[in-house]
Design a protein with these regions (language model features):
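N-terminal basic/disordered segments at the start of proteins
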Residues: 1-14
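Alpha/beta enzyme core
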Residues: 14, 19-62, 66-71, 75-85, ...
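Thr-Gly-centered strand-to-loop micro-motif
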Residues: 204-205, 232
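A short, acidic, flexible beta-alpha connecting loop/helix-capping segment that sits on the rim
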Residues: 234-240
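Nucleotide/phosphate-binding sheet-loop regions of phosphoryl- and nucleotidyl-transfer enzymes
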Residues: 245
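C-terminal extensions of enzymes
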Residues: 270-272
Length: 272
């Protein structure tokens, strides 16, 4: 592993090999997003909660650069692509909206791309080509690449899990340094996927639905299955204002501090 890549991955993942990243890049695709009406104010609070880092757009990285201009600043991962129009039978259209060079210039620690895979083969080929191009540039700059394989249109279930696991393997083969993917539903599949890929696997949260208890149980199971951490945004900051900061702290303690699922549930019940 090159020195620059090793250094940046060492910032993203703690000595325990884990990370807790809070995404705030949703406005890049969704525009106005509930819970993220003032991302700068949210970030100002979130920085003090113990999160290892944040996933953000180029514009947000530029606007909040001063928040990270100190020695112990959290890491930042730059979202370099976006997807528009994906709904029902429309696979949508994806495009690069930032670059590896932008991440280097702004002092970020990694770049992230989407990998929608329940799409026509021509779009799969274009996606693979786009990821390979970013990986090539990132390798030259020794910049880690996070890839997010996702079934955009399939309902949650075994078929979507199969698509995302299949795409995760392809992402690794394309050179991804980190795979961000949905929890596959049970610890056995999670462990098998982590063993197969051989690169850190971090779990996304998905749409801001479901219960806090369900989220905590999912995170606990994912970590038990070998996940190297979580990259969860909406299911945290779309909670009630009284809850989301306590939830973020509890997730940090689950990832790094050995807090069990049941203990985390107790913490949140006390906070509520």
């Amino acid at each position: 592993m090159s020195p620059g890549l090793s250094y940046r991955l060492g910032r993203i993942f703690g000595q325990d090999g884990r990370t807790m990243i809070l995404p705030i890049d949703h406005g890049l695709i969704g525009g106005r997003v509930h819970g993220l009406e003032n991302p700068r104010a949210l970030l100002d609070v979130a920085i003090g909660l113990g999160c290892d880092g944040f996933l953000m757009s180029q514009g947000m990285a530029q606007q909040t650069a001063q928040m990270f201009g100190h020695r112990d600043a959290p890491v930042r991962v730059l979202t370099v692509d976006s997807l528009y129009g994906a709904r029902d039978q429309d696979p949508g259209s994806a495009a690069l909206v930032a670059s590896v060079e932008t991440a280097v210039r702004l002092g970020l620690d990694a770049v992230k791309l989407l990998m929608p895979w329940d799409v026509p083969s021509a779009q799969q080929a274009a996606t693979a080509e786009r990821i390979a191009g970013v990986v090539k540039l990132a390798t030259a700059w020794e910049m880690p690449v996070m890839v997010e394989p996702i079934a955009m249109r399939l309902p949650q279930g075994p078929e979507a899990v199969e698509v995302e696991c299949h795409a995760s393997r392809i992402a690794m083969e394309l050179g991804a340094d980190i795979i961000k993917v949905g929890y596959p539903g049970n610890v056995t599949i999670m462990k098998s996927l982590c063993d197969e890929l051989g690169v850190p696997v971090v779990i996304l949260g998905g749409p801001g639905t479901g219960t806090v208890t369900g989220l905590l149980r999912m995170v606990g199971d994912a970590l038990a299955g070998g996940a190297s951490g979580i990259v969860i945004g909406r299911k945290v900051w779309q909670q009630d204002q009284r809850i989301w900061t306590s939830l973020a702290k509890a997730l940090v303690r689950m990832v790094h501090g050995g807090l069990t699922t049941d203990e985390a549930i107790d913490v949140l019940e006390a906070a509520g």
